Amino acid sequence: MPYEILIPRQVERQIAKIPREFATRILDDLEGFADGLDYKRYDVRKVVDSPKTAPRYRMRSGNYRVLFFILHNRMVIEVISIRRKKTGMDY
């Protein structure tokens, strides 16, 4: 059974600022991950300094990073933010 994806309004605004082809890829990756929770295929890892009671996770999708919570008891993935990865070329 797939997990439900919750995207708050502030994250929707972040998605609106991303070029369409990247936004589509990010949302497709999120949906694919929610269907099977395949951590390796979608490059999902626990954020290092996140609390053990409510760990945050990150997913890489191209040059973007998606931060989210996985609420297993409710079968929900709650997206916190979607940001562009900072590289040495960004000033």
Protein language model regions, located:
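A short, surface-exposed loop/turn module that caps and links secondary-structure elements
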Residues: 32-58
